[in-house]
From Swiss-Prot:
GO terms for molecular function: amino acid binding; ornithine carbamoyltransferase activity. This is Ornithine carbamoyltransferase, catabolic. It comes from Burkholderia pseudomallei (strain K96243). Disulfide bonds: none annotated. It catalyses: carbamoyl phosphate + L-ornithine = L-citrulline + phosphate + H(+). Pathway: Amino-acid degradation; L-arginine degradation via ADI pathway; carbamoyl phosphate from L-arginine: step 2/2. Keywords: Arginine metabolism, Cytoplasm, Transferase. It is an enzyme of class 2 (transferase).
Length: 336
């Protein structure tokens, strides 16, 4: 079966098949090697890419900008303070304007419906840099990183996600593992599992790929024998302090600490995090939480001991955001 990623959107990974995902991963590997060896060739000369950020970002913005610059493209950063989006101009109208000026558009924001609307009206490829429901560029980086740190083929790699599995990370880790035939475990309170219809959709993908999907409320069952443990923050900047109590009490059993990571029985288990992480109280939010919950001063979703240990590969994971995003840009806009 042939395929062509030229001018394709990247909105959730639902519409990308396993062969296309593997191609993007292989291309990211090749582009990373070329950058490291100084042999990279620009394929995006005279291309212009708009970066819409309704949510702030460090890694996603830097990854898109560096990936584009490395390949010879120009970018324009657009945030709510510097545009009329949502104030005087709808996303539909914004899409129709930007689509006439740019070769592609990246969007990082809130509802998946917004990025879908942008893609419907822009007439150029649209890339989802993060929505409440999905984080596809992060998934490519995560699988690339797991590949680099395992001598197993993808279908033999086992990984777990612990925490609030209703969010974009929980959804997306379940989805990409189901597509690629991997062994995926979700460890979370049942009330924080992905939506039932989404689980059913992933189970259908798993039936085709041979993936093994496990959802459990027992964190130790989730991580038994895994090669990688993923997590994400439990609370976000801007959430009312009153909302923290219920969330933290529900998720405390899923904290990634030395006891839990050693319970895998696998001395090669690695820890992954999409970042930022509250692994200490050196940030504004971390400090606020530590003041309210003194027992979490050394880490919330992950302890500082684990985060600063050799098991943690979160920063390689962060670097791979740039290489995988570059693969998306080149395959979509570079005509290869």
């Amino acid at each position: 079966m042939s395929f062509n990623l030229h001018n394709r959107n990247l909105l959730s990974l639902i519409h990308h098949n396993a062969r296309e995902l593997r191609y993007l991963l292989d291309l990211a590997r090749d582009l990373k090697r070329a950058k490291y060896s100084g042999t990279e060739q620009p394929r995006l000369l005279r291309k212009n890419i708009a970066l819409i950020f309704e949510k702030t970002s460090t890694r996603t913005r830097c990854a898109f900008e560096v990936a584009a610059y490395d390949q010879g493209a120009n970018v324009t950063y657009i945030d709510p303070a510097s545009s009329q989006i949502g104030h005087k101009e709808s996303m539909r109208d914004t899409a129709r304007v930007l689509g006439r000026m740019y070769d592609a558009i990246e969007y990082r924001g809130f509802s998946q419906e917004i990025v879908e609307e942008l893609a419907h009206h822009a007439g150029v490829p649209v890339f989802n840099g993060l929505t409440d429901e999905y984080h596809p560029t992060q998934m490519l980086a995560d699988v690339m990183t797991m590949r680099e740190h395992s001598d197993k083929p993808l279908h033999d790699i086992r990984y777990a996600y612990l925490g609030d599995a209703r969010n974009n990370m929980g959804n997306s880790l379940l989805l990409i593992g189901a597509k690629l035939g991997m062994d995926v475990r979700i460890g979370a309170p049942k009330s924080l599992w992905p939506a039932a219809d989404f689980i059913a959709q992933c189970e259908a993908f798993a039936a085709e790929s041979g993936a093994r999907l496990t959802l459990t409320e027992d964190p130790y069952e989730a991580v038994k024998g895994v090669d990688f443990i993923h997590t994400d923050v439990w609370v976000s900047m801007g959430e009312p302090v009153e909302a923290w109590d219920e969330r933290i009490n529900a998720l405390l059993p899923y904290q990634v600490n030395r006891k839990l990571i050693e319970s895998t029985g696998n001395p090669r288990t690695r820890f992954m995090h999409c970042l930022p992480s509250f692994h200490n109280c050196e940030t504004k939010v971390g400090k606020q939480i530590a003041e309210r919950y003194p027992h979490l001063k050394d880490g919330i979703e992950v302890t500082d001991e684990v985060f600063e240990s050799p098991r943690c590969i979160a920063f390689e994971q962060a670097e791979n955001r740039m290489h995988t995003i570059k693969a998306v840009l080149v395959s979509t806009l570079g005509g290869i």
